């Protein structure tokens, strides 16, 4: 996004927040359901100062990280195998495509029955929710590799390790990283869904509790925290993608 475009977006957001603040203060908006932005900011500062809220954020962050570290290598490896082994791909890909299109939330009660309401249940459900987009991303990444370059490399005696390092990885990197970024969105959503639906800790659990008790400033403040963390993670992955893009061009 160009600088002037960022300025326009920032000005639009600031204008909306100012309008929201004014309407809430003069009573045109029900402050019980939509408290003024200044009130939300005050609640945000108070929440970040509470040890139990920071502990809940740490729990959610740990679950998201654990699920991501399991889902990414597993999903991409499965995608690589399905693309490289035609028989396996013919057998498994229809199931992967089917499950990818099914809302994963319908399986949440099954995970609760199997694992109970626990951290392993949340991690397992997040992995299940995330892995399909990574498998499909792995398949697409392998299919993006120029086959003529692979054949020429083999003719000139390149080893399999050299082919993977010099041809496969540079060609696959953009799709793999884009799949990882998209997978993180599924991952965070799955963990929060578990915590809101049934959990004893985590920021999703607290969001559900504040919503049920109509503690709207705390609810909105928590949503701001989650959104900010999600954007930060996405931008971090985007920065990695940009750096690896430069490496890909050199390769």
Regions found by a protein language model. Name each.
Residues 137-182, 207:
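Short cytoplasmic-facing helical segments at TM-TM junctions of multi-pass membrane proteins
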Residues 113, 142, 189-226, 245-251:
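Glycine-rich helix-loop "coupling/hinge" segments at transmembrane-helix boundaries
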Residues 86, 143, 174, 178, ...:
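C-terminal transmembrane helix and the adjacent membrane-cytosol boundary/short C-terminal tail
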Residues 76-112, 136-145, 151:
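Cytoplasmic-entry segments and transmembrane alpha-helices of multi-pass inner-membrane transporters
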Residues 7, 11, 15-19, 54, ...:
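Hydrophobic alpha-helical transmembrane segments of multipass integral membrane proteins
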Residues 55-63, 113-134, 177, 218-223:
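Loop-to-helix entry region at the N-terminal start of transmembrane alpha-helices
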Residues 124-128, 160-194, 221, 233, ...:
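Transmembrane alpha-helices
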Residues 2-3, 26-72:
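Periplasmic/extracellular loop-to-transmembrane helix junction in inner-membrane transport proteins
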């Amino acid at each position: 996004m160009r600088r002037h475009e960022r300025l326009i977006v920032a000005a639009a957001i600031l204008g909306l927040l100012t309008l929201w603040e004014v309407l809430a203060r003069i009573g045109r908006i029900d402050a019980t359901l939509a408290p003024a932005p200044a009130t939300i900011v005050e609640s945000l500062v108070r929440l970040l100062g509470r040890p139990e809220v920071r502990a809940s954020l740490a729990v959610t962050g740990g679950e998201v990280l654990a699920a991501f570290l399991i889902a990414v290598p597993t999903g991409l490896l499965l995608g690589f195998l399905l693309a490289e082994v035609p028989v396996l791909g013919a057998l498994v890909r229809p199931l992967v495509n089917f499950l990818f299109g099914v809302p994963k939330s319908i399986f949440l009660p099954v995970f609760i029955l199997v694992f109970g309401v626990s951290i392993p249940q949340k991690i397992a459900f997040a992995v299940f929710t995330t892995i399909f987009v990574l498998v499909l991303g792995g398949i697409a990444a392998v299919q993006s590799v120029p086959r003529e370059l692979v054949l020429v490399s083999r003719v000139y005696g390149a080893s399999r390790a050299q082919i993977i390092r010099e041809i496969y990885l540079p060609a696959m990197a953009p799709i793999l990283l884009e799949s990882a970024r998209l997978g993180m969105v599924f991952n965070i959503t799955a963990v929060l869904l578990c915590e809101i639906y049934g959990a004893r800790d985590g920021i999703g659990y607290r969001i559900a509790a504040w919503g049920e008790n109509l503690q709207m400033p705390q609810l909105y403040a928590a949503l701001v925290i989650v959104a900010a963390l999600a954007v930060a993670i996405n931008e971090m992955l985007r920065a990695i993608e940009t750096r690896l893009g430069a490496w890909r061009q050199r390769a």
